[in-house]
Amino acid sequence: MDLELLQDLSKFNFPTPIKIRSKTSKTKKDEGDDDEDDLRCSTPTSQEHKIPAVVDSPPPPPRKPRPPPSAPSATAALMIRSCKRKLLVSTCEIIMNREEIDRFFSSVYNETSTTAKRRRSYPYCSRR
């Protein structure tokens, strides 16, 4: 561009720029205008437009009925009375004593240790 052309621009009389009001450039004196309120969209704030508050909450779900307590045996009743907490007494221990149980398991272990395991042989598979 020529410098002469830039200097000649000041000689031209341009009209004053038009000022357009925007919502962000609103001043306090402009807030009193009712004409702009009619053109603007706003959320209704009256009581009839509000969502009603929840007054009641739903009832809790019904509780499952508890089963009635079973009657304990005579030895279990003695043990329960002696402790504050309920003890779980196995019926196997009441019927059998420990020596019978030990004899049973020792006989099972003795039988398995004497027999040797046999390996399977597959004739169609060759060893490498």
From Swiss-Prot:
Interacts with CDKB1-1. Interacts with CPR5. Disulfide bonds: none annotated. This is Cyclin-dependent protein kinase inhibitor SMR1. Expressed in roots, leaves, stems, siliques and flowers. Expressed in the root elongation zone. Residues 17-74 are annotated as: Disordered. It is found in: Nucleus. Residues 57-71 have a biased composition (Pro residues). Keywords: Cell cycle, Nucleus, Protein kinase inhibitor. One of its GO terms (cellular component) is nucleus.
